[in-house]
Amino acid sequence: MSCPYAGNGNDHDDSAVPLTTEVGKIYGEYLMLDKLLDAQCMLSEEDKRPVHDEHLFIITHQAYELWFKQIIFEFDSIRDMLDAEVIDETKTLEIVKRLNRVVLILKLLVDQVPILETMTPLDFMDFRKYLAPASGFQSLQFRLIENKLGVLTEQRVRYNQKYSDVFSDEEARNSIRNSEKDPSLLELVQRWLERTPGLEETGFNFWAKFQESVDRFLEAQVQSAMEEPVEKAKNYRLMDIEKRREVYRSIFDPAVHDALVRRGDRRFSHRALQGAIMITFYRDEPRFSQPHQLLTLLMDIDSLITKWRYNHVIMVQRMIGSQQLGTGGSSGYQYLRSTLSDRYKVFLDLFNLSTFLIPREAIPPLDETIRKKLINKSV
């Protein structure tokens, strides 16, 4: 049956007049299916001992790599749009659309893992010997995704050698080096956040107003705690308020913030963090609606990559246990489990924004000057 969207929907109309006289490519030629469908070479079959599930293993990983290619394509286009001094609202909408596409692709990749889990550990053992020294650690495209997203080299868990050294191909190494040098999505989003309207000290000066609101909020909390009749409960509440004050100090004191960045506990510059907090507070304002969606999608991407890593870890443990080495010589399960930590979470600061929230009624109201400025559709 032919595709109803490609023609007039009549499978038997041999007299249909072509829409163009140019000779086009047919479906298989356009998609190069002869190459694509001939790329599943089962090593067990070459060894005259074919293992049925090796075919599933190959197909699943090839599908991953195809989707990785699309994610890289989307990331590169998004980085190009963000790498500008001014980003108008139409571009922000396109960035949101493409980030959402990446989110949907990652959801699909997470859902592919259960298909691979239909293979039992014994089935996997039947062909695992053919895989060495190949390893998922050698996926160039996944490393490029990490770098383009913003995973820092110093944040990576080392195993045996530097991650780029597993690639013997010089072209692959050049791709890795270029992806490390080019501005990552993290860096470009940071620059964009630093330009958030309303942060200017000579204008609305959101940061100063926010600090005043936090001081008033904490002071009200102290007054409420002092009225607590039970001494033990009062002391507990006062101690909790002091802890919260220290948490806020970590964002209001630039030196403390910078120390946390150097330690790897924060990613954004101090100015970018201010922008992210402002967008979060005023997300209901039309001007900040799309930026808030953008930040939410970045967290979704981080979350889904973590879920994919987790599913991969669990699958590896089911297939080879937690003591065996991986096929590429890595520590297998132990190495993969270590990648689930926050050090691999690129937009960690966005996840932690909720730490610094204050009640809605305490949020500094926007004045007419900043409201007029927010009508400007570019930033």
UniProtKB/Swiss-Prot annotation:
What this protein catalyses is:
L-tryptophan + O2 = N-formyl-L-kynurenine
Residues annotated as binding heme: 312
Q: Which InterPro entries match?
A: Trp/Indoleamine_2_3_dOase-like, Trp_2_3_dOase
EC number(s) on record?
Answer: 1.13.11.11
**Which pathway does it take part in?**
Amino-acid degradation; L-tryptophan degradation via kynurenine pathway; L-kynurenine from L-tryptophan: step 1/2; Pigment biosynthesis; ommochrome biosynthesis
| Quaternary state and interactors | Homotetramer. Dimer of dimers.
- Report the sequence similarity comment from the record: Belongs to the tryptophan 2,3-dioxygenase family.
Q: What is this protein called?
A: Tryptophan 2,3-dioxygenase
Q: Gene for this protein? A: v
